Amino acid sequence: MLGTVKMEGHESNDWNSYYADTQEAYSSVPVSNMNSGLGSMNSMNTYMTMNTMTTSGNMTPASFNMSYANPGLGAGLSPGAVAGMPGGSAGAMNSMTAAGVTAMGAALSPGGMGSMGAQPAASMNGLGPYAAAMNPCMSPMAYAPSNLGRSRAGGGGDAKTFKRSYPHAKPPYSYISLITMAIQQAPSKMLTLSEIYQWIMDLFPYYRQNQQRWQNSIRHSLSFNACFVKVARSPDKPGKGSYWTLHPDSGNMFENGCYLRRQKRFKCEKQPGAGGGSGGGGSKGVPENRKDPSGPVNPSAESPIHRGVHGKASQLEGAPAPGPAASPQTLDHSGATATGGGSELKSPASSSAPPISSGPGGWICTPLSPTWLAPHESQLHLKGAPHYSFNHPFSINNLMSSSEQQHKLDFKAYEQALQYSPYGATLPASLPLGGASVATRSPIEPSALEPAYYQGVYSRPVLNTS
């Protein structure tokens, strides 16, 4: 056993010369395989004269407090081992061995010295207060809570340098929401640009920095959103800068006062207005622009598709046929119910129209010349025919004039028959169309050729051609 212990000196005189100071006890080489029992204690007593150590005063509380602990101590000086010391020298060594002291840093540890002392009562009295002071510092588990606390505190301190505090965080509102809140809280419901800036900075500390960036965004939001209206200063309010207010129709952008997300975009409603601030009269701007060509139409300046979209309601007033296959029967029906304007259109148009065969398949392939279409279109526009809404290019309501609304049911039945019949098929005689037969009318009137012309222009056929 003694061969495993390597000390600087083998004699007691050498040992005392190395450690002349009685208040210093340095640990040397770890002692392994410390057996429990008094046999090891006797061997250690023979190896080191304990009389000199006890008489030198190492067992006093002062000596314990001044002694240096080796960092290599493991769980040997745990509170359980220290608590086993007052039971006697043999019990103390047994408890230390049971605690797993395989890597004790010193043979002359405080527990070993306390158990090896010649006066057990005095050594235990001195070890009592020392054990209380040793518990928090020598136990390995004592460092865990304090280290965790320090790491947690250090991490929190580092996080504060990288993260803003809660009041200085970026608010979850868009610029449109901020402007709307600022304008709505004003007593006059209007603010200048500088007043909007100031209100945002007063309420949200986040916007007190990088002012140039977000102020540019505020200006862009005011300019490019139709819900904000610019109001000029009145003479009784002199100053610099115009006022900004909310559009009267934009009150429902935010639902229940929640400014986190807009319920609907007011820009879509305001976009048709081509004029300035108010959007009340601007909602009708697009239909009026589409119906703008009220004078004579130049056939060279407009494409056939453009003429077909803009003038179909007025051109087809005298011939309310929904499809190209309705040529002979529709002519008889329209001839019986045509108005005065329709009869006036037949005289110049019939003189310039080419003669076409009476068969239903012959006139479909015949192209329509623009020279005939131009005077027809111009006379219709000069007549001042009413304009209709363009829901569908060949809607029955759009192709019908106001004087022919009483025949609406007849045309509905006729339209249903055309959707399920081929071009050359004969129509049922039960339809209330009336008039002469197909063979009695050889020339086809030009007003009935309009659906045939537009059928080739539109990419999507209206009738079923299978």
Curated annotation (Swiss-Prot):
**One GO BP annotation here?**
positive regulation of intracellular estrogen receptor signaling pathway
Show the PROSITE patterns listed in the entry. FORK_HEAD_1, FORK_HEAD_2, FORK_HEAD_3
Region of interest called Essential for DNA binding, as start-end residue ranges on this chain: 251-288
Q: What GO molecular function annotation could you give as one example from this UniProt entry?
A: DNA-binding transcription activator activity, RNA polymerase II-specific
- One Pfam family of this protein, by short name? Forkhead_N
InterPro entries given in the database record = Fork-head_N, Fork_head_dom, Forkhead_box_C, FOX_domain-containing, TF_fork_head_CS_1, TF_fork_head_CS_2, WH-like_DNA-bd_sf, WH_DNA-bd_sf
Which residues does the record list as Phosphoserine (modified residue)?
A: 303, 327
Q: Where along the chain is composition biased (Gly residues)?
A: 273-284
**GO cellular-component terms in the record?**
microvillus; nucleus
Feature: compositional bias, Low complexity:
318-328, 344-358
Instruction: Report keywords, A-Z.
Output: Activator, Chromatin regulator, Developmental protein, DNA-binding, Nucleus, Phosphoprotein, Repressor, Transcription, Transcription regulation
Where along the sequence lies the DNA-binding region?
A: 169-260
Region annotation (Disordered) ranges? 269-358
- What's the stated role of this polypeptide? Transcription factor that is involved in embryonic development, establishment of tissue-specific gene expression and regulation of gene expression in differentiated tissues. Is thought to act as a 'pioneer' factor opening the compacted chromatin for other proteins through interactions with nucleosomal core histones and thereby replacing linker histones at target enhancer and/or promoter sites. Binds DNA with the consensus sequence 5'-[AC]A[AT]T[AG]TT[GT][AG][CT]T[CT]-3'.
Assembly with partners or alone: Binds DNA as a monomer. Interacts with FOXA2. Interacts with NKX2-1. Interacts with HDAC7. Interacts with the histone H3-H4 heterodimer. Associates with nucleosomes containing histone H2A. Interacts with AR. Interacts with NR0B2.
Return the protein name: Hepatocyte nuclear factor 3-alpha
